[in-house]
A protein has these predicted regions:
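Short, well-structured hydrophobic secondary-structure segments
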Residues: 39-71
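Conserved NAD+-utilizing ADP-ribose enzyme module
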Residues: 1-37, 60-62, 73-81, 87-189
Length: 189
């Protein structure tokens, strides 16, 4: 499948030298600075959950994010490069980017509008104004079934198809030089 990914220019150097690029912990720490621990845990969860759907070697812990549409790809910026890549089906996983936002914020990923409404009513019944507190604080100890319901729903990011295909993204766990079809460098505009 054809994808587009924006990466730091150092990724191109690594691809030229080694023939592949693998996201390393230090890259995430450098990019995200003071909030890197949040992203490291989030991406580690994502990889663990993704292993239910795709074979990912144990030493690969962090995903490379891919746009499924050229129209929706991140645009080039200074010190960044766009790679157009053709990735074998066994090497990528598609997820619902809209639902990924729910996971990022520790929210319940509903099956549909009716399920979302029922969930919101359940939160209201218990007087819970901020559902993320069920996962991020000790409040979840008082509502363990509700907390577990939220956590179990997160795998739906891989199974619920969005109404709008532009809300899909791909991930892979390495880029190989032979997958690169085009490289676009930042031209200053």
């Amino acid at each position: 499948m054809r994808f587009w990914t924006r990466q730091h220019e150092a990724v191109w150097d690594e691809l030229q030298k080694t023939g592949q690029y693998i996201v390393k912990k230090e890259y995430i720490e450098e990019k995200n600075d003071t909030i890197s621990e949040f992203y490291l845990k989030l991406y580690e969860w994502y990889t663990k959950a993704a292993r239910k759907y795709i074979d990912i070697p144990e030493d690969l812990k962090y995903p490379v994010w891919l746009s499924v549409s050229e129209d929706m790809m991140l645009q080039p910026t200074e010190h960044a490069i766009i790679f157009e890549v053709e990735i074998p089906e066994s090497e990528y996983l598609i997820c619902n980017f809209d639902k990924w936002g729910y996971r990022v914020n520790y929210f319940y990923v509903p099956l549909d509008e009716a399920d979302e409404k029922a969930h919101m009513e359940e939160l209201k019944k218990y007087g819970i104004a901020s559902e993320d507190s069920l996962v991020t604080t000790s409040k979840g100890n008082f509502y363990p079934l509700l907390r577990q319901k939220i956590i179990k729903s997160w795998d739906r990011i891989f199974t619920i198809q969005p109404d709008d295909p532009s809300l899909m993204v791909g991930t892979c766990w390495k880029l190989k030089k032979e997958w690169i079809k085009e490289v676009r460098f930042y031209d200053g505009e």
